[in-house]
Structures are given as structure tokens and as C-alpha cells.
Amino acid sequence: MKISIIGTGYVGLVSGVCFSEFGFNVTCVDKDKNKIERLKLGEVPIYEPGLEEILKKNTESNRLSFTSD
């Protein structure tokens, strides 16, 4: 299943990362290009325990991607 998340604020980012951890293919979309570039580098702009590690793991396995398009 493919899931799109609109917005990478606290709720959108955590939801998208968690869905990808469950095995879904997730694309997170945000209009803030700087935030998207940081997320692509594995930099998490919010504090949530363990989120950065899960994000990196699922980005590397191609289940999680970020775009501003």
C-alpha cells in the first residue's frame, strides 16, 4: 500500500515515519523545501524519542521518501 502524508509537522512526520515502519510505502509532502532537504539528510526537526533512527532506517530501505512537489 502507498500512503501520502501532506505536511511534515509533528503529526504528519510522526505518522508517516510510523506507517513506513509498519511496512507501508510512504511519501511525505511539504511546501517547505528547506525542511524537506533536511529530512532527506536524516535530520529530524522535532523531538520524538527514536524517530530519527526509524526515519533513517526506512529512508534507506526506500519505504519513506520526502518531496516538496
Language model features with spans:
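Structural/interface elements that position substrates and couple domains in central-metabolism enzymes
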Residues: 1-69
